[in-house]
Amino acid sequence: ESDRNRLCMYNLATGEKTYLTESFDSNVDDFCWSDTKDAMIYFIGVWHATENLYAITKKGEVKQLTDYCADFGSLQMLGDHKHILAERHSYGEPADLYVITPGKDIAKTAIVQITAENKHITDQLAKIQVEKRWVKTDDGKDMLYWVVLPPHFDANKKYPTLLFCEGGPQSPVSQFWSYRWNFMIMASQGYVVVAPNRRGLPGFGSEWNEQISGDWTGQCMRDYLTAIDDAAANLPYVDKDRLGCVGASFGGFSVYYLAGHHDKRFKAFIAHDGAFNLESMYTDTEEAWFSNWEYEDAYWNKDLSANAKRTYENSPHKFVDK
């Protein structure tokens, strides 16, 4: 739940720290080091809702080496220091292992799949379709959201549609494969899934990511409504009379909040382990630093801070009658 994960080199002899990924304005999620004359460091970074492989050169330049509509992770440099073992997954594919031979750029990087652990199952399943869509937010920013389409999709039909609310709150809506909130399962039940990269997510620059801190019920909630309104108005297969809202953790909080502020957009809500009462959460959590950072103060001091006052006054439990 850090605002930004950076890669830092620490000199044990001098105590000097050198931050290596300052030019990459997003999160570093995993890394490995090639013990060769080039001494390359490779890392997984999230950008525009996918997690791909990057390299840091001797000159401190960050270069992207893969560009898949998928997420890579769990990097391990192999013994020859010329190949990297990694796992890759997406909304339609559970994780498998790949061997990556890094090149100087995307075109010269080779990838070979070496496992297919679930092929005997996935071969029996109809495939989903996944599309990217960009929309202007109410404050004039460009926002990306994923559209997940059901198997055997027919553009001439109308489909019930789910707005997916991400947790974190600063976790990317990338091409994750989840065994809990699985978009393939949702779509296979006949739903279109709309998954916005709303304010407060990495992969779109620090300003976009950090905006949510202290503003849990402001711009990020308007971003959610922008996405579902765009889908309902401009995607003819979305049934605007059958919209649902789902999410876990901060996504669950978002569902609770939107249930009191959706202006009759949604017919159903599903929340998993979301914060419902922020006053109760403040006194219950062991992660006191997080609450103090996000809420700015305890609820009994809410009148001492404009941000704290706004936060507690917008706790979802205060809108159960809406």
Task: Give short role names for the model-derived ranges.
Residues 1-8, 19-28, 43-54, 68-70, ...:
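A flexible loop/linker signature enriched in serine peptidases of the S9 family
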Residues 11-15, 56-61, 102-105:
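Short loop/turn segments that connect beta-strands within beta-propeller blades
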Residues 18, 22-29, 34, 116-131:
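Surface-exposed loop and turn segments in beta-propeller and other repeat-based domains
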Residues 31-40, 75-83:
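Blade-terminus and WD-like Trp-Asp/Gly-His loop motifs, strongest in beta-propeller folds
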Residues 62-157, 174, 178-188, 230-233, ...:
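Non-catalytic accessory segments flanking enzyme active sites
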Residues 143, 160, 242:
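Alpha/beta-hydrolase fold active-site loops
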Residues 153-159, 164-205:
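Short substrate-entry loop that stabilizes the transition state in hydrolases
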Residues 182, 187-188, 195-322:
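Active-site-proximal cap/loop segments of hydrolase catalytic domains
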